[in-house]
Amino acid sequence: MSTTKVITGKVRFSYVNIFKSRAFQAGQDAKYSVCLLIPKEDKATIKKIKAAIDAAVQDGISSKWGGKKPANLKQPLRDGDAERADEAPEYEGMYFLNCNSIQKPGIVDKDLNEILDPDEVYSGCWGRASINFFPFNTNGNKGVGVGLNNIQKLKDDDRLGAARASAESDFGGDDFEDDEDF
């Protein structure tokens, strides 16, 4: 029997929202989410993901899509080289998946100790994820979604996204004196 649950190999986390749920559009339910960047050379993880997607599609055929596979089925596994590499170099050589959950995921370190500090797991660090694939049919959109179960942080790396300078570095070099012209 095929399973829709996958424990990934080592992946890079991007767009990390796992400590506080967030609604991405007005009127949507707040969810915990993360984008997983999966190295294309991790053939074992890719194989497990493709098998889980196939299992979710088979489930959808019988439970959501009226006995047949829709022609324009939305697929969760996307190619970073084809879709994002021009705007985000960290997507080069990667597949990516967007995962979310209404429930907060379990978050642990490599020794399985719970991580409570939101600064400890960030966009750019590496880890593993427990995810599940499911069919959906919402407002005419049909496809396979990805649920987020748990996160395990394994290693630090450079932060991704808009790194902000500290206030000290922004203002520390100026010799600013009180000016009565204000």
Predicted features, each with a name:
Residues 111-127, 134-144:
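Exposed beta-sheet edge/beta-hairpin loop segments within beta-rich domains
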Residues 1-5, 10, 157-182:
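Acidic, gly/ser/pro-rich intrinsically disordered tails
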Residues 139-158:
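OB-fold/S1-family single-stranded nucleic acid-binding modules
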Residues 99-116:
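A beta-strand/beta-hairpin structural motif
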Residues 1-96:
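OB-fold ssDNA-binding interfaces and closely related basic DNA-contact patches used
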Residues 38-40, 133-135, 155:
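Beta-strand elements of well-folded, non-transmembrane domains
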Residues 101-103, 133-135, 150-152:
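Short, flexible loop/turn elements at secondary-structure junctions
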